[in-house]
């Protein structure tokens, strides 16, 4: 996600120009935050969010808007589902729809990396067992422990009700203009739509979260600015 930081910072500045107090959260063990990822838990990350929100609301009592990218989007939804705070809107960029699927994708990165480096192969099942046994696993330069992986996999999207009083904005990448969002996304959007106002928008900028080169996403930025104008 490091390659997304410049894009996220650019959008944060745009939100600030629109009058929002905007803070980017580095969760425990990530970015510039203290601690190591191997010691992180989802409970700590929820606490990071809560403390950040407390600080912002102490500065100025404004409506609360949550914004997240990929796993951060799923964590924002999870926080809103558990918090007693009133959230007005939630902005989701290319949201992860399942913690279990996300962890599977992360583990596959290790499988692919071992293959490319001609190292002894592992399967996702074997990596899961290592994590369950208390081992730490290196993936893409980060060290993952079983506790955080289990926490993320256990996020229960069926509890995602009463998340916000306003609109849940779902922004998702499509290969071609006019295409619908993916099937897993559509299922979760339909579920959320039973109890929320959901605004689905698509964009076809480069998928910055998965490409190696730094790039721009002008369509995504423009859509996001319009949402909270």
Locations of the language-model features?
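Short, surface-exposed "cap/lid" segments of acyl-processing enzymes
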Residues: 1-27
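Terminal, non-globular segments
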Residues: 13-16, 23-25, 188-191, 221, ...
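Short beta-to-alpha linker loops that shape the active-site pocket of alpha/beta-hydrolase fold enzymes
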Residues: 21, 26-31, 96, 204-206
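Catalytic nucleophile-loop/oxyanion-hole region of alpha/beta-hydrolase
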Residues: 30-61
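Alpha/beta-hydrolase fold nucleophile elbow
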Residues: 57-71
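Gly/Ala-rich beta-loop-alpha elbow adjacent to hydrolase catalytic centers
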Residues: 67-76, 94
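Active-site signature of alpha/beta-hydrolase-fold catalytic machinery across serine-
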Residues: 78-82
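The alpha/beta-hydrolase serine catalytic core
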Residues: 86-225
